[in-house]
């Protein structure tokens, strides 16, 4: 059965108030729509962990620093609702823009430190937009748990820190990246790739796995990175914005995985910006 689509905050709060009175836990899955199996895995995790589940769909203009990217972002509300129907979610919150950013809205949530590198450095203002809208969605839904994919690892860390710092009583649950058979991380942006582009994009993950394996065997990232960038270039990737080894908890740059670490990348292929990351096994002392 299809879940109700709610566009007004008052309607959302009426629903969640009833659930809370009944002592039911609420999970939220924030999305920008164009749902794929990665999103649906978050919905399944939320259903398993909470009594009630709200999926939010809002293409947030404040997190796009490129107007053309915003204009191209797919809007597929009816298809999204159809994909959610088998999961039995309790509400789909598709807020009208003025429910998020009413006239006179003047507040921005900014998280320093974690946002100074990688996505934050490449997309100025992006994470301020993310933190602001996610803070609003956390507060509007009153959810107990929020589900985010590890594909957007830096974003997941950002919203976790934001909720902690602002004393928002919610637990951020990270869920594994869902991948295509080729290893390509599922993303709404993938639908903009041609068939040939999808094939070439599938070469990103094997390059990352090879680097991770050699790091775990003791090689230094400084020695491996040039070859990895060359391999990505040969696959058709251009403008590799970052290819970094970072500490998993602080995003501090590393040369060897002497602590829990992630390998993270952002690069362009056929006019589409792709990001990915994987865990790297920690070296033994």
UniProtKB/Swiss-Prot annotation:
The active site is at residue 39. Its EC number is 6.3.2.1. GO terms for molecular function: ATP binding; pantoate-beta-alanine ligase activity. One of its GO terms (cellular component) is cytosol. The keyword Plastid does not apply. Belongs to the pantothenate synthetase family. HAMAP family: PanC (MF_00158). Homodimer. The reaction proceeds by a bi uni uni bi ping pong mechanism. This is Pantothenate synthetase. The gene is panC.
């Amino acid at each position: 059965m299809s879940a109700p689509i709610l566009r007004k905050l008052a309607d959302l709060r009426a629903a969640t108030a009833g659930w809370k009175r009944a002592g039911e836990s609420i999970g939220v899955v924030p999305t920008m729509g164009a749902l794929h199996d990665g999103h649906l895995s978050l919905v399944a995790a939320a259903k398993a962990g909470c009594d009630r589940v709200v999926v939010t769909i809002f293409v947030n203009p404040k997190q796009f620093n490129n107007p053309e990217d915003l204009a191209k972002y797919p809007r597929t509300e009816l298809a999204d609702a159809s994909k959610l129907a088998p999961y039995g979610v309790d509400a789909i919150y598709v807020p009208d823009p003025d429910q998020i950013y009413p006239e006179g809205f003047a507040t921005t949530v900014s998280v320093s430190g974690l946002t100074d590198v990688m996505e934050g450095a490449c997309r100025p203002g992006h994470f301020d937009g993310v933190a602001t809208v996610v803070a609003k969605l956390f507060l509007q839904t009153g959810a107990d748990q929020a589900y985010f994919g590890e594909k957007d690892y830096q974003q997941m860390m950002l919203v976790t820190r934001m909720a902690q710092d602002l004393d928002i009583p919610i637990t951020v649950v990270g869920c594994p990246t869902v991948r295509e058979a080729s290893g390509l991380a599922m993303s709404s942006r993938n639908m903009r790739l041609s068939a040939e582009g999808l094939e070439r994009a599938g070469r990103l993950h094997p390059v990352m796995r090879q680097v991770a394996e050699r790091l775990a065997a003791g090689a230094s990232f400084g020695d491996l990175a040039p070859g990895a960038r060359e391999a990505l270039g040969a696959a058709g990737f251009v403008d590799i914005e970052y290819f970094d080894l970072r500490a998993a908890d602080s995003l501090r740059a590393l040369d060897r995985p002497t602590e829990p670490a992630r390998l993270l990348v952002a690069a362009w292929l056929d006019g589409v910006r792709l990001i990915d990351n994987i865990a790297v096994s920690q070296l033994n002392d």
